[in-house]
Amino acid sequence: MKYKLSEVMDLIGGGTPKTSKPEYWNGDIPWLSVKDFNDGFRYVYETEKTITQSGLENSSTKLLKRGDVIISARGTVGEIATIPFPMAFNQSCYGLRARNGIVTSDYLYYLIKHNVSVLKKNTHGSVFDTITRNTFDNIEVEIPSIETQEKIASILSDYDEKIELNNAINNNLLEQLNQLFIEFSTRCEWNYLSIGEIAEKVAMGPFGSNIKVSTFVESGVPIISGNHLRGYFLEEPSYNYITEAHADKLKNSIVYPKDIVFTHAGNIGQAAMIPDGCEYPYYVLSQRQFYLRCNTMMVAPEYVLLFFHSKQGQHELLSYANQTGVPSIAQPASNLKKICLPIPPISEQKKWLLVVEPIIAMYQNNYQETKRLSILRDTLLPKLMSGELDVSDIDF
């Protein structure tokens, strides 16, 4: 049966308590903004900010229930997640609550996920793309029976549950790596050396004029941007590409496995290593990145990576940040070379790596499996939602 998208759910608006009222903030109620759920995972469990009951009662924000869906509606449009427990949210998002008897909460999540591209095409606004209430009125969807909805949601949820499990395991593995670094780096009073002393090379990405949209091609050498550096290791969702001939002219900005890539403008503080077994043999940086190639006769790149994810490493890196305008690190290559860290003897590092490398390998295996599961899920999604794959004979 056909419905307007607005007819299958209740649309709930968010809000922000007054920031001038400290009694409204840092309470027990999670308060969502898009940065909390833009990672592609189905559920959102943590928020950067929290509010108090007084903040909830004295603002236009609302409390979403378990199973409700949240969607970003302004600026970064179309990020979605399911709410696992009550959370409030800001005015740049909508809460979507399934209407009983028409759709289930699980099916609504996948219905919205399937229609994100349609929602984006129906945005409004001259400055920022914005999803409005009218957007949902203008989209028509075919809704199957509740029984069919439950079957479809169950199939897709199996993939998301495994993806969530892999993510939880990997978060635990990162905690182990961080602890191993802290224990090793503080075990003795190791000699301090500067990055300049342990680096084989520190170099910048190209000037912006050397890589622009007009130079992109369908395949070739992938360009690394901040979107690929959100964790400890290079993430490979999708790329823009330049030709090999073009990349050859940018040799100073080419990076390889074991190089550590940093962001110096925008999301400063990012530091990710290109792992062994990555998708491509080499990459080119965008203009907002720079990189460190370690002298492996002196230091293990894994050790340096974990240093820059420690509190001390982040403090050292961000101490060179400009305090005005767009967040950026001043003279990134020069200042990176000045940063000092404790360097154990390479013989001790090799013993440490015997413990660390299997953990990294497990992390990468989980990451690759998650990529495969995500591709399978996203391939099945349109086929299931359109009815191309018939689930009527499937028993649960």
Regions found by a protein language model. Name each.
Residues 3-22, 35-66, 196-213, 227-263, ...:
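Sequence-specific dsDNA recognition surfaces
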Residues 112, 116, 120, 160, ...:
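Short amphipathic alpha-helical signal-transduction/dimerization elements
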Residues 1-15, 138-207, 343-391:
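Non-catalytic DNA-recognition/assembly elements of restriction-modification systems
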Residues 73, 87-94, 127-153, 282-290, ...:
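A short glycine-rich beta-alpha junction/loop motif
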Residues 33-34, 47-113, 225-226, 246-313, ...:
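A short beta-sheet element
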